[in-house]
Amino acid sequence: MSNMNQTIMDAFHFRHATKQFDPQKKVSKEDFETILESGRLSPSSLGLEPWKFVVIQDQALRDELKAHSWGAAKQLDTASHFVLIFARKNVTSRSPYVQHMLRDIKKYEAQTIPAVEQKFDAFQADFHISDNDQALYDWSSKQTYIALGNMMTTAALLGIDSCPMEGFSLDTVTDILANKGILDTEQFGLSVMVAFGYRQQEPPKNKTRQAYEDVIEWVGPKE
């Protein structure tokens, strides 16, 4: 195994869902910016980046969220950095956001945009993304998990611990964030939380995973 391959495998064996961080140890600004950039630079379906990353460092807000986040209580107390990942709503071909992405970010020529919109609509129909608002939002939310995974892997490569979390009251937390002007519920929904820092102690047991042959199947020669 090459040095790079070993480095990657070591990072995946190092990573675990850290329940309690050492509150005295903080992730450096440089390292955390690298983690955020790995999220921002992540791939997404059609390259539309339907996400927003909100870093919650205000302890009073963390305490308020903790009361309604049973799966994140210890992390909210102890994590060096705590991130909420929002998923964008209404990502359709003619929505203002998609038009902004096509015209201002991707710089499509105006005459090519109708053809792009047509292909976009066909894709969403074929994949049942445009069936209803929930399907459309779920598609956006799926993209946030790509960024989430990349952020946690980047952290592990830097020797930083992390924990992804869905253990919260979605409606209540959404209301808190909306009332504080942090979450525009017309544009976004809260997809997932993730905490970063340094473990308070080693995991109580070794990482467990199913065997390679139970989850991986080759069709054709294994090369």
From Swiss-Prot:
Cofactor requirements of the protein: FMN
UniProt KW Transmembrane helix keyword: no
Enzyme class: oxidoreductase
Pfam families in the cross-refs: Nitroreductase (PF00881)
Molecular function GO labels: oxidoreductase activity
EC number: 1.-.-.-
GO biological-process terms attached to the record: 2,4,6-trinitrotoluene catabolic process
GO cellular component: cytosol
Keywords annotated in UniProt: Flavoprotein, FMN, NAD, NADP, Oxidoreductase
Similarity comment: family membership: Belongs to the nitroreductase family.
PANTHER family linked: NADPH NITROREDUCTASE (PTHR23026), OXYGEN-INSENSITIVE NAD(P)H NITROREDUCTASE (PTHR23026:SF125)
Protein's name according to its UniProt entry: Putative NAD(P)H nitroreductase SAOUHSC_02829
Organism: Staphylococcus aureus (strain NCTC 8325 / PS 47)
